[in-house]
Amino acid sequence: MTPRGRIAGLSGILAGVGLAVEGALWATSGWTADTFGDSATALAFLRDHGSHLRAAVLAGAINLVLVTVFTVGLAARLATTAPTRAAATLYLGIIGIAGHSLVPLGLRLGVPTFVELAVGDPSAAAAAWSGYASFQTAAGAVGALFLGLSTLAAGWAIISLRALPVLLGWLGVLTGAASAVTVLTAETPLAFLAAGAYLPSLTLAIVFRVWAGIGLWKGEVQPAVEQGRPGHQRPAPNLGS
């Protein structure tokens, strides 16, 4: 079963807006890329800004529900013309959502635990933080990589078979590639690319979700070859889809 086009479209629009809200909450919490790298800094941050951070990750968890409905609906739209790439969009997206869901849920539950532990046993809290932070980083990387690959597959299908506007397809490819770069170049000599691609990948993902959501809402299908009119041949099957 798949969601109705308008439900999937609305979910995509809200997922884009939700990602912007989540990003704004993270930014206004005072968090930076280096905050979680040092246990003392991280625990002090959780003590002072834990409530703000928990609001941000709650928004993220809600947003992932919307992304799930949107991804299933988008894959269903693409399946009629590009079944293989639609399957990639769906399954890669589900893996990415599952991985990424561990980040907001882990922080939502972990923040009060670490704050309490830091008060009672600072040494134990500091010792436990390193492993916890590494797990959070890994879960986020799984989410970013597989959601990026899902978006790239969707963009490729749109470009090839005109299931939605071609410019949206190119945006999807660019979004997915940027997201993959943020993961694959991290902790390498090319780490500067990961840092530089992070904000653009986030912005592109917001635009892609909103635009694709609008397309699903409107039911904009643009067949590559118009069928049913005299003088027009049926298109040959696309064996590479």
At which residue positions do the language-model features occur?
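Hydrophobic, aromatic-enriched alpha-helical segments typical of multi-pass transmembrane helices
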Residues: 1-241
